[in-house]
Design a protein with these regions (language model features):
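Short glycine-biased active-site loop of nucleotidyltransferases that positions the nucleotide triphosphate
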Residues: 1-5, 217-219, 281
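Short, structured coil segments at secondary-structure junctions
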Residues: 6-7, 78
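C-terminal cap/loop subdomain of S1 sulfatases and analogous C-terminal strand-loop tails that border
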Residues: 7-10, 71, 204-210, 237, ...
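Active-site-proximal cap/lid insertion segments
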Residues: 14-36, 51-56, 62-246, 258-266, ...
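A Trp-anchored, charged/polar loop motif used as the substrate-binding/catalytic surface
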Residues: 38-52
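Alpha-helical elements of the RecA-like P-loop NTPase motor core of helicases
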Residues: 44, 325, 338
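Short amphipathic alpha-helical coiled-coil/interface segments
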Residues: 353-357
Length: 381
């Protein structure tokens, strides 16, 4: 956020993305330095507020974690959580990007090209206390020395980085899991669980080596899909699964609807309350629109837009080169390794999806030309 939160009675936020260890945070406008692991601190502040709130009033708590954002630094207690057992590699860790356009090849978010010494934990964070640094060094230093001694290159280096990445990323997730458990336990202990809606989600997905990548941004499945788990006693049924197309633009309308507040007409999502009740509206969306702008930094992911249905995904990559399309069949090719846009067997599908993209652009009032300032503050290349 470029501004302080508004409309909240109390808030703790990280400046920018924040740091993992001993972070400064902004509490109701005042910057305060804390000692501890950021995921634990965010959980602590959430529980403190729950315990001191006015119990006679309804509440909304947003417990939003930094983890597992880059650079994926685990809690020190979780270093070595997997016992150094290797993680399975995705089948397309060494994607050649055959049959696809320039954009997927000319990016800057690959484990091979973009992974830094900080990402790989070859350098310790500067915010650690001396005692924390000892714990950090006890785990990483012997392994880093072994890595430096081995002089890895090529695919062997990519594989080593992938294993380090997965250890650290999943180590971050362990602390998030623990924090979620603490909040749910408190709701049970305080007798609030039966009258509280809990929504677990994320702002985006993430590549864990698929296509050789880390990070997000792309319209591809690993980045596009997010978790969405809802507990609403008396409304959602345990084990209930929804396969409808939903989006994080639906969240605000859902919260307002559940609270009995009128939804502003300018909002572009839709309330999920009927779906959560098992009553999907007959006119629920069958497709949705995606648009990514930020270019060339970070990561050189070209501006692109697209439309997604239950089976197909049409992508239009439009800058800085001349626009071109790619079509993916999500059922025939779930890993999205083949572009079907020039396959005669998919000609009608391309036509249908192009029309759907145009319809959604009109419906959402997307400008005919993307404003230059949407791309960021660097010149297009």
């Amino acid at each position: 956020l470029m501004t302080d939160p508004t409309g909240f009675d109390e808030w703790h936020i990280l400046p920018g993305q924040g740091i993992y260890y001993n972070p400064p945070m902004i509490h109701n406008g005042k910057k305060v330095k804390h000692e501890g692991y950021t995921t634990d601190l965010i959980t602590d502040f959430s529980l403190e507020w729950l315990k001191k709130r006015d119990p006679s009033k309804p509440f909304l708590l947003m417990c939003q974690h930094k983890a597992p954002h880059r650079e994926w630094s685990p809690a020190l207690r979780h270093l070595g959580h997997n016992g150094d057992k290797p993680f399975a590699e995705p089948a397309n860790l060494f994607d050649s990007y055959a049959n696809r356009g320039l954009a997927v090849r000319d990016q800057d978010m690959s484990i091979e090209k973009t992974f830094t010494e900080t990402d790989a934990k070859l350098k310790a964070p500067g915010s650690l206390t001396p005692e924390q640094k000892k714990q950090w060094d006890a785990y990483y230093e012997p392994r880093n020395k072994e890595f430096e001694k081995s002089q890895l290159s090529g695919s062997d280096l990519v594989r080593w980085r992938y294993q380090r990445y997965m250890h650290d990323y999943l180590g971050c997730i362990k602390a998030v899991d623990e924090g979620v458990g603490r909040v749910l336990d408190y709701l049970d202990e305080a007798g609030l669980a039966e009258n509280t809606i809990v929504v677990y989600s994320s702002d985006q997905g993430f590549f864990l080596g698929e296509h050789g990548w880390f990070d997000k941004r792309w319209i591809f499945e690993e980045s596009l899909r997010t978790p969405l788990v809802v507990r609403w006693p008396g409304v959602t049924q345990p084990g209930q699964v929804c396969n409808e197309i939903v989006s994080n633009v639906d969240f605000a309308e859902t919260f307002l609807d559940a609270a009995g507040v009128e939804v502003p007409k300018e909002m572009q999502g839709a309330s999920l309350v009927p779906i959560l009740k098992g009553q999907t509206p007959a006119d629920w969306r069958k497709s949705f629109y995606y648009h990514y702008y930020e270019y060339p930094v970070p990561h050189r992911v070209r501006p692109h837009e697209g439309v997604i249905t239950d089976q197909f995904k049409l992508v239009r990559i439009y800058a800085p080169e001349e626009p071109y399309f790619e079509l993916y069949d999500r059922k025939a090719d779930p890993a999205e390794m083949k572009n079907f846009s020039n396959d005669p067997a998919y000609a009608e599908t391309v036509k249908m999806m192009t029309a759907e993209l145009a319809k959604l652009r009109t419906q959402l009032d997307v400008p005919a030309e993307t404003p230059r300032e949407a791309f960021g503050n660097r010149p297009l290349e």
